[in-house]
């Protein structure tokens, strides 16, 4: 496929959200969930659990989000299961299957970041889903290898911006001595800590990369659904991002229809709500999983559409 023929991730995700509702189901094989499903906490249980989720919900939800750490904890055999899950999702449902966001939160510099990009974003890599979560805290520019390869292959990125863990405050809410410039970078400094917050600068950089994209750009942000007034408090312009907003914390972590609408406001149509435990706890019965996912998708649609 030529570069001009690649359909960008943002366009594919927007279509999937329209078709199935703005819901992403996380595949998080906690030891406790494996036990609840009557499965052993080993590679056999990991594989059985993950593929049951894909088999039950493939073609029924906008995306899956396997959390890489729960596969990596089982070593090389666990990583092989992650590869199998990505391939199964690609085959689940009509057309190109169900989108997969690999939640690995990679972030590094130079050749190391290039290697991560090749592992998770290159055509032909068994670990390459449709998008990857990345960390900007070595500087947004350190993500350039991933940005460039994702654009070339039609894949997407979700950059950590405003996360729901309380520890994120000390970095994401911190004020820098710069303000966003026309290129989304540092627009100037007076040496005092009165400029934009780290979160606002992250959003501004994503907005530049997504400029002119329709219906959505392919560089999204991770913005927790349970962050309260953090968007306003940090001066983060989510509407200007023009990209998808991955919102963990829906369901078991406490975010419902009211929290989604309040947190995201005018940017809510770009939100992809992510639910893991609230859906997975309904298993292992496939019909119960389908019903739980349908209920979660309905709630997300009511809040965001």
Across the structure, where does each feature detected by a protein language model lie?
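Conserved anion-binding
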Residues: 108-220
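Conserved, mostly hydrophobic/aromatic
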Residues: 25, 64, 103, 132, ...
């Amino acid at each position: 496929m030529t570069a001009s023929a690649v359909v960008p991730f943002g366009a594919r995700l927007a279509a999937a959200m329209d078709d199935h509702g703005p819901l992403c189901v996380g595949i998080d094989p906690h030891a406790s969930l494996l036990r609840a499903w009557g499965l052993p906490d080993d590679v056999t249980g990991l594989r059985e659990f993950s593929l049951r989720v894909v088999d039950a919900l493939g073609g029924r939800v906008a995306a899956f989000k396997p959390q890489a750490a729960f596969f990596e904890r089982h070593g090389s055999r666990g990583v092989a299961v992650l590869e199998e899950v990505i391939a199964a999702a690609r085959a689940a449902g009509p057309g190109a299957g169900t989108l997969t966001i690999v939640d690995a939160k990679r972030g590094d510099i130079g050749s190391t970041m290039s290697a991560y990009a090749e592992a998770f974003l290159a055509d032909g890599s068994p670990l390459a889903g449709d998008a990857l979560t990345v960390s900007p805290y070595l500087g947004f520019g350190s993500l350039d290898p991933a940005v460039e390869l994702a654009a070339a292959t039609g894949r997407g990125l979700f950059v950590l911006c405003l996360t729901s863990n309380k520890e994120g405050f000390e970095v994401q809410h911190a004020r820098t001595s710069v303000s966003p410039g026309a290129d989304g970078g540092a627009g100037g400094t007076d040496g005092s800590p009165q400029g934009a917050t780290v979160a606002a600068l992250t959003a501004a950089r994503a907005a530049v990369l997504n400029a002119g994209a329709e219906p959505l750009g392919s560089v999204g942000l991770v913005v927790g659904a349970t962050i309260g007034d953090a968007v306003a408090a940090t001066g983060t312009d989510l509407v200007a991002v023009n990209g998808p907003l991955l919102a963990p914390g829906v369901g078991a972590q406490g975010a419902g229809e009211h929290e989604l609408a309040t947190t995201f406001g005018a940017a809510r149509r770009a939100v992809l709500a992510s639910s893991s435990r609230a859906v997975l706890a309904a298993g292992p019965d496939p019909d119960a999983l389908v019903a739980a996912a349908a209920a979660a998708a309905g709630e997300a649609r009511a809040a965001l559409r």
